[in-house]
């Protein structure tokens, strides 16, 4: 499980505009952790992802701290909420088999279920009201039937 400092480092790494997941993956492979990526010199990061992507760390976007506080509030806002990074023991093995697994997972509920046989409902980050209603209805129906 990530502590508060590790979560902030992961969040900053993944929310840096212009870096992308591929850039984040390369930096993580080179430096070992999100915290070490942020502690690395600009020159060291440039060697891994090139100058334009490395420069993305020079300025922190204004909205980053607002989004970070919102994510932290979500984490502290209910029982069973946590964040798993791709190296976490509880990270779902099946996701590691996909071409581009998420580097962070926001989880609510019992993490031990993540490695059981399951069904995923995949949607949009910007779902319509109807789409959200449909997802809730599908989820409720499926959970009632095991």
Whereabouts are the PLM-identified features?
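Short, positively charged patches
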Residues: 1-145
């Amino acid at each position: 499980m990530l502590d508060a400092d590790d979560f902030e480092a992961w969040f900053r790494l993944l929310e840096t505009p212009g870096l992308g997941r591929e850039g984040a993956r390369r930096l993580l492979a080179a430096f070992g952790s999100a915290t070490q990526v942020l502690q690395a010199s600009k020159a060291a990061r440039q060697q891994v992802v090139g100058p334009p992507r490395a420069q993305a760390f020079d300025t922190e976007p204004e909205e980053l701290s607002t989004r970070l506080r919102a994510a932290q509030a979500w984490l502290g806002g209910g029982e069973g909420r946590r964040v798993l990074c791709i190296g976490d023991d509880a990270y779902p093995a099946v996701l590691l088999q996909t071409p581009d697994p998420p580097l962070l997972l926001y989880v609510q509920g019992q993490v031990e279920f993540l490695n059981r046989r399951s069904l995923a409902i995949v949607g949009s980050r910007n779902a319509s009201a109807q789409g959200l209603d449909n997802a809730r209805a599908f989820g409720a129906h499926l959970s009632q039937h095991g």
